[in-house]
């Protein structure tokens, strides 16, 4: 499995203290992704990156690729870190350290500055979702398999508890459905939200364009909060729980200050 890391050993490659003027759009660098595969870099499958497209092929595995976007490109991560070499989850202080580095250089992305996100994706087949969630929309243990998932992790304004919204492509769960996944570790309890952006096999093998209002959906899920800083964007294709193969391509992920005129707001 290929792991692409564009990093600086000390993790301090981005320079400049002057806050850049905010552009109307922020296209993500689609060539810089860090791997998380839940199998210590041994998850079966492969990734292909080129031409502003990343294609993830998961073979009975769960493959995730992520980056920390900033106003001037992905935040470099030190490739010598043990959890990076193991394709593991970020260690406990990573979020705080990454935020501090970006804030010192005034390059953090505020969700309210870029409320819209658009992207294109294509799948080669849907994944069985008959055992994904219960009737209340709670994702069942072993049910979190999706052919394509694009996730956004954010912090609430003035807070440090991570918020996550991910858009997924399902087989039969209706478009527009919001699912929730609950997880816990020691004294912490997490709730991750998945919103069905595409459903069904009609467009398998075809590129689909999506546009979402992050602020609007954040406020719908957390009505008493305001979104703060964008922390991480990830792509995930997985079939480990259902024992299936899944392939998805992702392209042209862009953050927008205003609703893109040439994109369908319902997509």
Task: Identify the function of each model-found stretch.
Residues 233, 251-255:
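Extracellular beta-strand elements of beta-rich domains used
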Residues 45-69, 82, 90-100:
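Short carbohydrate-recognition loop motifs
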Residues 120-126, 155, 215:
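Solvent-exposed strand-to-loop "edge" motifs in beta-rich extracellular domains
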Residues 133-138, 145-150, 190-192, 204-245:
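Extracellular beta-strand ligand-recognition surfaces/modules
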Residues 72-89, 98, 106-117, 201-204:
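Extracellular/lumenal carbohydrate-interaction signature centered on repeated Trp-anchored short motifs
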Residues 123-130, 158, 241-244:
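Extended, low-complexity, turn-rich repeat/linker tracts enriched in Gly/Pro/Ser/Thr and Asp/Glu
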Residues 14-41, 265-267:
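Extracellular carbohydrate-recognition regions
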Residues 162-221:
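Extracellular carbohydrate recognition and processing domains
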């Amino acid at each position: 499995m290929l792991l692409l890391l564009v990093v600086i050993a000390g993790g301090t490659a981005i320079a400049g203290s002057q806050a850049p003027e905010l552009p109307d759009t922020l296209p993500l660098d689609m060539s810089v992704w860090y791997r998380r595969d839940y199998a210590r870099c041994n998850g079966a499958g492969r990734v292909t990156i080129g031409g502003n497209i990343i294609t993830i092929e998961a073979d009975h595995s769960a493959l995730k690729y992520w980056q920390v976007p900033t106003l001037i490109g992905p935040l470099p991560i030190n490739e010598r870190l043990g959890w990076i070499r193991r394709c593991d989850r970020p260690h406990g202080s990573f979020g705080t350290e990454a935020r501090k580095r970006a804030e010192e250089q005034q390059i953090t992305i505020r969700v309210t500055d870029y409320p819209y996100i658009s992207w294109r994706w294509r799948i080669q087949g849907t994944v069985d979702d008959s055992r994904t969630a219960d009737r209340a929309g709670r994702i069942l243990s072993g049910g979190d398999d999706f052919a394509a998932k694009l996730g956004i992790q954010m912090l609430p304004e003035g807070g440090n508890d991570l918020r996550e919204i991910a858009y997924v492509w399902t087989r039969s769960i209706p478009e527009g459905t919001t699912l929730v996944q609950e997880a816990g570790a020691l004294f912490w309890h997490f709730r991750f939200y998945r919103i069905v952006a595409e459903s069904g096999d009609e467009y398998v093998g075809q590129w689909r364009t999506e546009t979402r209002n992050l602020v609007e959906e954040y406020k719908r899920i957390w009505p008493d909060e305001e979104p703060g800083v964008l922390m991480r964007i990830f792509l995930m294709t997985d079939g480990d729980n259902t024992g299936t193969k899944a392939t998805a391509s992702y392209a042209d992920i862009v953050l927008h200050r205003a609703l893109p005129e040439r994109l369908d707001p319902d997509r």
